[in-house]
């Protein structure tokens, strides 16, 4: 037939949607090692506001909590937090603590995540300090077409209403933000006027202000889909209360028995303000792909 033409080759190119639950299941199924993947779809449906809270839902992962009771460090397969490391988009990041190399995961807002990948087995392509495992935070990528997403939530903790306790605050100006050693160097001799005068004044409130959580992301592709741009931001302003019991134990003189010498039951009023922003640009060229990524995270507690 004159209308028929012989085709030598047909190439069909598709793009995988990594942020869906189906993609997460396929990634785990086809992985060469033991993986757990939390997709963006699952993260958005959960009430978790940071990466540490999201990891609590992953099997084989235990979270170490700080003094206020908030999840902070990941313990993979029962091994201490120093036996695993953290990646952002596949790149190892340093710790904000100058004495340790493990990362507090409660400083990363979950709104910025595209997916969360937890590797529980050491393979040849990993570094030697991944004996426990690896946590890879994959941030949002530019979509195939223009997309804008926004979310906002408001709520309140019933801890203070239910327990009948006041929410305590203080004036930040009453605190000395930096020690003289940090402000003036190790050779400086501290003076009395380098410190604030008087005790910190506590203010009592019937209840804290409402909690607010909000996020916004905008992405699109330009220049014939070769240039991708993704901008995202997140704000989390939360108030909560907690309590802990501390005790000191001593050995009774002349007896093989121990007793509690001091017992303290403390109540905490906590205000956490976490802000985060990230920008990602990618340029696709024939045979190459260039990516530039930057993230800003700040937590004030």
Feature-to-residue mapping (PLM):
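Residue-level detector of the transmembrane beta-barrel scaffold of outer-membrane proteins
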Residues: 85-87, 115, 147-151, 228-230, ...
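Short strand-turn segments of transmembrane beta-barrel domains in outer membranes
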Residues: 145-221
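Short, acidic, small-residue-rich periplasmic hinge/interaction motif at the N-terminus
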Residues: 1-44, 69, 81
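Extracytoplasmic beta-strand/coil segments of soluble accessory domains associated
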Residues: 35, 52-92, 115, 120, ...
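Structural signature of outer-membrane beta-barrel domains
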Residues: 17, 81, 93, 155-159, ...
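Transmembrane beta-barrel wall of Gram-negative outer-membrane proteins
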Residues: 195-301
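Short acidic/polar hinge/loop motifs at secondary-structure boundaries
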Residues: 63, 91-120, 140, 165-173
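Transmembrane beta-barrel architecture of outer-membrane proteins
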Residues: 46, 50, 71, 103, ...
């Amino acid at each position: 037939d004159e209308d028929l033409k012989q085709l030598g080759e047909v190439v069909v190119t598709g793009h995988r949607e990594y942020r869906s639950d189906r993609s997460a299941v396929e990634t785990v199924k086809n992985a060469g090692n033991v993986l757990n993947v939390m997709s963006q779809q699952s993260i958005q449906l959960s009430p978790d506001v940071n990466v540490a809270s999201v990891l609590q839902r992953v099997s084989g992962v235990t979270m170490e909590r700080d003094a206020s009771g908030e999840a902070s460090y990941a313990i993979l397969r029962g091994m201490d937090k120093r036996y695993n490391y953290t990646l952002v988009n596949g790149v190892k990041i340093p710790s904000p603590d100058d004495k340790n190399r493990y990362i507090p995961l409660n400083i990363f807002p979950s709104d910025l995540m595209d997916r969360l990948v937890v590797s529980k087995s050491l393979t040849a392509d990993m570094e030697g300090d991944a004996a426990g495992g690896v946590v890879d935070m994959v941030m949002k990528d530019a979509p195939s077409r223009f997309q804008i997403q926004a979310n906002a939530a408001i709520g309140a903790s019933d801890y203070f209403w239910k327990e009948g306790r006041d929410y305590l605050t203080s004036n930040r100006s009453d605190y000395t933000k930096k020690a003289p050693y940090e402000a003036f160097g190790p050779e400086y001799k501290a003076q009395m006027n380098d410190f604030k005068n008087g005790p910190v004044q506590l203010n009592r409130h019937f209840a804290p202000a409402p909690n607010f959580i909000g996020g916004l992301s905008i992405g699109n592709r330009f220049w014939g889909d070769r240039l991708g741009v993704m901008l995202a931001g997140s704000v989390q302003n939360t108030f909560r209360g907690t309590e802990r019991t501390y005790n000191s134990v001593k050995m009774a003189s002349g007896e093989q028995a121990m007793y509690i010498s001091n017992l303290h039951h403390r109540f905490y009023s906590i205000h956490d303000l976490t802000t985060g922003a990230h920008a990602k640009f990618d340029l696709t060229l024939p045979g190459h792909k260039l990516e530039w990524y930057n993230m800003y995270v700040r937590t004030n507690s």
